[in-house]
Amino acid sequence: MFFVLTFIMAFRSVNVGVDTAPYSRIFGIIHHASSFREAIELAPLSAPIYVGICRILGLFSAEPQILIIFTALFINIGLFVFINRVSSNVVISTFCWIGLTLFYCSMNGSRQSMALVITLNALVYFARDLKSKKGWILMLIAIGIHSTCLIIAVAILGIILTDKIHESRLVLIITVIISALISIVFKGIVRVLLQFFPHYSMYGFGGAQYSIFESNGGGRIVILYIFLLAICVLWTIINKKQNESDSFHSKMLPAVVFGAVFGIFNCRNELINRALWFYIGIFITFIPAVIEKCKGLVKWIIDIIIISVLAAYSLLSLLENQNGVIPYALFWQ
């Protein structure tokens, strides 16, 4: 499966993925800059490590396809390293990567997806030891590629919470309350800021077609966030206490709950939906962990529900072409 996903990503046309063409142009700007410093000044992004990667790739080829191939390898290697380290079911995790539409997103926001897979691997180290040098080095690299990964600070605070409180349901309740309060305050701040910067209202209150559910509600993606929150609740029902045999997912409980709750409150904010990729990414191994804890008929029912919901969500994303990956074309066509 690794080779299939990598092939689809690596050899796609520059027109597959909304941000693929813009990043190809940025690659050209960086490549033709006379120095690394000039490249940083000319590139319309604050990502020194990403600029450095483009400069190095430019030594081998001036064609932007080399960047597309490299990011495909980078993302998929990082993804499968993470999955193999903590997932109880590699196949289901891979399905979740596609079902949660992160695979399509990776062909759109490839730079953010690079930061995402690095951050996920950093969290594995943090779950073991918050002082992990490897974890912090990975985070610094992720920040140098896409600074939105800083939103994962909440997950780090969540690890501290689970070190203090071992009752899963209490962790759930505390996280839901804190996440809701943060969301309410955040929405208030956004409303105030939009009074001064009204041209950003399309990001704050949903200007994209796929974010609106029957043109009045909170945004259709809210259904996904509610579904993910239900999975978090199911985890706490199954694991009343922290599961020592699966300490990673026990320590990620506050993170996934925050991602779901914050998403519910801000489902019409396009920028927040994109930033929450870092939390949705944790679900690609969290969901198989929940399924594994279920037994007998319950396990089959949960399997069917999760697979059906994610398959429908993924298909709808493709039909609406939210990430610009349809029609798909190979770069030599």
Give the role of each language-model region.
Residues 21-29, 36-62:
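Short hydrophobic/aromatic helix or loop-helix immediately within or flanking a transmembrane segment
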Residues 21-24, 31, 36, 51, ...:
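Alpha-helical transmembrane segments and terminal signal-anchor/GPI-anchor hydrophobic tails
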Residues 54-58, 67-78, 283:
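Transmembrane alpha-helices of multi-pass, membrane-embedded glycan-processing enzymes
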Residues 80-100:
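Transmembrane-helix signature of polytopic, membrane-embedded enzymes
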Residues 102, 134-158, 260-264:
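Membrane-interface alpha helices of multi-pass inner-membrane proteins
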Residues 107-113:
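Short acidic/glycine- and proline-prone juxtamembrane loop motifs at membrane-interface regions
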Residues 119-133:
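Membrane-interface transmembrane helices that cradle and orient dolichyl/undecaprenyl
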Residues 172-178, 295-315:
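Signature aromatic-anchored transmembrane alpha helix within multi-pass, membrane-resident enzymes
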